[in-house]
């Protein structure tokens, strides 16, 4: 059981946000790119990109990209002048979930954990996964407790430590089993 592709992006309307467009670069429609992927350059492995315009995802092809200073810039097809590109500043870059690599049965993406119910090894329902935090030493599940939690908890932070705390992730049943004291 391993987590692959630790993307810390949100899934919205069947799209997965992988980064954001920054300010323009030059006069020919190039834009700075801020990638949320572990390896920043891998954002360019996904095509097409989707940008949200007036509440709707619109498909764009990356015509070209290059490294610039400490970051990256790209040229989107159809954006040929600075003024058009400026309208895209700060737009989120999303992809279709089908673009992600297939994983083996014991692997999953972080986004799949959102909404899963978390139970102790003794069967107590701790609540639902609402967020994941990267702390440096280990990742942490943020669990929203059930309304009538017997221990009076509203939220729990559970370290994502495979085998030690996380005993099983069942993607099909949308359930995570943990060795955790419900009082914490």
From Swiss-Prot:
Q: Does the keyword Repeat apply?
A: no
Q: Where is the PRC barrel domain?
A: 104-184
Q: Which GO terms describe its molecular function?
A: ribosome binding
Xref: InterPro entries: PRC-brl_dom, PRC_barrel-like_sf, RimM, RimM_N, RimM_N_sf, Transl_B-barrel_sf
User: Which biological process, per GO, is one annotated for this protein?
Assistant: ribosomal small subunit biogenesis
HAMAP family from the UniProt entry? Ribosome_mat_RimM
What is this protein identified as?
A: Ribosome maturation factor RimM
Q: Which organism is it from?
A: Vibrio atlanticus (strain LGP32) (Vibrio splendidus (strain Mel32))
């Amino acid at each position: 059981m391993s987590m692959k592709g630790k993307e810390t992006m949100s899934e919205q309307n069947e799209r997965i946000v992988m980064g954001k467009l920054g300010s323009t670069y030059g006069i020919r429609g190039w834009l700075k790119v801020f990638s949320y992927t572990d390896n920043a350059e891998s954002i360019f492995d996904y095509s097409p990109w989707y940008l949200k315009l007036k509440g709707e995802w619109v498909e764009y092809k990356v015509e070209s990209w290059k490294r610039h200073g400490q970051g990256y810039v790209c040229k989107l097809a159809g954006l040929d002048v600075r003024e058009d590109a400026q309208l895209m500043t700060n737009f989120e870059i999303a992809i279709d979930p089908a673009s992600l690599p297939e994983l083996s049965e014991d692997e999953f993406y972080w986004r799949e954990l959102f909404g899963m119910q978390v139970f102790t090894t003794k069967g107590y329902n701790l609540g639902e996964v609402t967020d994941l935090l990267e702390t440096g030493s280990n990742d942490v599940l943020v669990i929203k407790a059930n309304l009538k939690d017997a221990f009076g908890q509203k939220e729990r932070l559970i370290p994502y430590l495979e085998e030690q705390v996380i005993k099983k992730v069942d993607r099909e049943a949308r359930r995570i089993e943990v060795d955790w004291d419900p009082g914490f």
